[in-house]
């Protein structure tokens, strides 16, 4: 096997792992919203996602999908997003910008998968 040189730091590797894993889970679940590829995401999104992964990799990480969803909502509101019935990346509207209890079971499951992927990345991606 040839040499593999990765230019990403640890947080970037973990972020890509979690993001791509969550995207694959969304595809497998036939979710109505499947994220664009990591390299196609706008820089403010990637920067906030890296902060989420940093937080999820330390001792102050969110332990529950509900807690993580609340943090996700705060991050999206800070980036200028708002609630809308139909997802529109250009208009910055998202149907999941609602309290956790109002999410569908599919969206709750996606949040649980995200928490699990963060834990796998924290322990096993180096």
PLM feature spans:
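Alpha-helical propensity feature that highlights long, continuous alpha-helices across diverse contexts
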Residues: 1-126
């Amino acid at each position: 096997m040839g040499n593999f040189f990765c230019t990403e730091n640890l947080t970037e590797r973990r972020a890509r792992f979690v993001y791509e894993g969550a995207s694959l889970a969304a595809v497998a679940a036939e979710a109505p919203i499947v994220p664009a590829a990591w390299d196609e995401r706008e820089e403010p999104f990637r920067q906030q996602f890296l902060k989420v992964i940093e937080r999820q990799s330390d001792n102050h990480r969110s332990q529950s999908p509900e807690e993580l969803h609340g943090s996700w909502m705060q991050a999206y509101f800070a980036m200028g997003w708002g609630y809308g019935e139909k997802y529109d990346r250009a208009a910055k509207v998202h149907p999941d910008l609602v309290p956790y209890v109002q999410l569908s079971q599919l969206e709750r499951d996606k949040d649980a998968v995200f928490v699990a992927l963060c834990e796998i990345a924290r322990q096993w991606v180096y």
